[in-house]
């Protein structure tokens, strides 16, 4: 008796063809031109126009690569900018959350960045994204912009005094949270290091 149905095998072959020679080959069928893996940037902007299943596959490839570097190799820093891209997939959120919990044991760090806190407060992901704000030992919090004050304070676990420090937009000013300590930072660009 057959282990796989003919229909399933046909779907697999069509998927492989698409990834190797078809429409998705631009994402999956290429050789790297990166001679060193000391500093890598995966630009995900082009993925936004891909089909959801292709986008999810590519995001998981990136997550798997990052996870290996962070948790197996260690002594690595990974940054996920434009985090909203990952929030449409509950499995990706869980993957990121679990990675955040374990990276410090391997002398690694994970940076999460997003311009819009409201992306984390959507009904379908709210409970899953809440821990993303309580796990990191270091947080740099900037002015909330137009987001509701109470939502901002609740999501980031801020009291009134902490919120008031960053209530108004000020270039380079942020609240730095490190454990139970709080610092108001003013960040300046030093031309010496450029």
Regions of interest found by a model, annotated:
Residues 1-108, 112, 124, 165, ...:
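P-loop NTPase motor domains
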Residues 91, 95-188:
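Conserved ATP-driven motor cores of ASCE-family P-loop NTPases powering translocation/secretion/packaging/pilus
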Residues 192-194:
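Conserved small/polar residues in nucleotide/adenosyl-binding loops
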């Amino acid at each position: 008796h057959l282990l796989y149905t003919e229909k399933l095998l046909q779907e697999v072959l069509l998927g492989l063809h698409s990834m190797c020679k078809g429409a998705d080959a631009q994402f999956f069928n290429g050789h790297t031109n990166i001679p060193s893996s000391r500093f890598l940037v995966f630009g995900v902007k082009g993925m936004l126009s891909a089909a959801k299943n292709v986008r999810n596959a590519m995001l998981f490839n990136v997550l798997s690569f990052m996870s290996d570097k962070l948790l197996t190799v260690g002594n690595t820093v990974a940054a996920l900018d434009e985090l909203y891209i990952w929030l449409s997939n509950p499995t990706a959120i869980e993957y990121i959350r679990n990675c955040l919990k374990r990276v410090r044991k391997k002398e690694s760090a994970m940076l999460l960045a997003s311009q819009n806190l409201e992306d984390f407060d959507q009904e379908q992901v709210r409970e899953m994204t809440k821990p993303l704000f309580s796990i990191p030992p270091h947080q740099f919090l900037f002015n909330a912009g137009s987001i509701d004050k109470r939502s901002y304070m609740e999501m980031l676990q801020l009291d009134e005094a902490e919120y008031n420090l960053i209530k108004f937009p000020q270039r380079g000013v942020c609240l730095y949270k490190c454990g139970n300590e709080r610092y108001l930072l003013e960040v300046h660009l030093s031309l010496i290091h450029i």
